[in-house]
């Protein structure tokens, strides 16, 4: 009969696995935030070529220039 035993993961490997899970969660969160921003801009604007955001005295303007061939 084959005798097998499980070797516990070292603390380093456990920490690496935890860090990878956190890294993946951060990437997913960033993607969700970006998609939400694009959808919000599409809902409030007709297109994404020009977006202005004003907060108090600060204004952020984003312009996209493109040419179709």
Curated annotation (Swiss-Prot):
This protein's name: Regulatory protein MokC
Q: List each coiled-coil range.
A: none
Q: Give the source's domain of life in one word.
A: Bacteria
Protein family: Belongs to the Hok/Gef family.
Free-text function comment from the UniProt entry: Might be the toxic component of a type I toxin-antitoxin (TA) system. Regulatory peptide which completely overlaps hokC and enables hokC expression.
Q: Which InterPro entries match?
A: Hok/gef_toxin, Hok/gef_toxin_CS
UniProt keywords, alphabetically: Cell inner membrane, Cell membrane, Membrane, Toxin-antitoxin system, Transmembrane, Transmembrane helix
Pfam families, sorted: HOK_GEF
- Give its localization: Cell inner membrane
An example of a Gene Ontology cellular component annotation for this protein is: plasma membrane
The membrane-topology field of this record reads: Single-pass membrane protein
> Key word Membrane present in the record?
yes
Spans traversing the lipid bilayer? 24-44
Keyword Transmembrane applies:
yes
